[in-house]
Amino acid sequence: MHEMALTQNIIEIVEEQCRRNHVNKVTDIWLEIGPLSCVEPDAITFCFDVYSKDTVMENCKIHFIPVPALAYCWHCEKTVKIKTHHDACPECGGVHLQKQGGDELRIKEIAVE
């Protein structure tokens, strides 16, 4: 479960920002997550609840913002939405796609008191 390491990294980043900005309490965190990221939001939430104990993020709520997976089709020359790494172009059925997003897991926003 690589979500454990990802969650620890998220916590480290948020803690560093809190130190820099003299913040004592984080109430909400919004994460952008793409369908190609291979990350399970439920696993992130579970790990976050465990690792955030006794930190400025204890009882913080995690929100997930879905980011579409886009790819450029070399056959029909269109940018299309895809759902998995192995999708064909939904417009023409072409298989030569260049992914242009959808694999991200990014901290978008942090709400503090």
Swiss-Prot record:
GO terms under biological process: protein maturation; protein modification process
Keywords associated with the record: Metal-binding, Nickel, Zinc
Binding site for Zn(2+): 73, 76, 89, 92
Gene Ontology molecular function terms on file: nickel cation binding; zinc ion binding
Similarity comment text for this entry: Belongs to the HypA/HybF family.
NCBIfam families listed in its UniProt record: hypA (TIGR00100), PRK12380.1 (NF009046)
Known role: Involved in the maturation of [NiFe] hydrogenases. Required for nickel insertion into the metal center of the hydrogenase.
PANTHER family from the UniProt entry: HYDROGENASE MATURATION FACTOR HYPA (PTHR34535:SF3)
Protein name: Hydrogenase maturation factor HypA
Organism from which the protein derives: Actinobacillus succinogenes (strain ATCC 55618 / DSM 22257 / CCUG 43843 / 130Z)
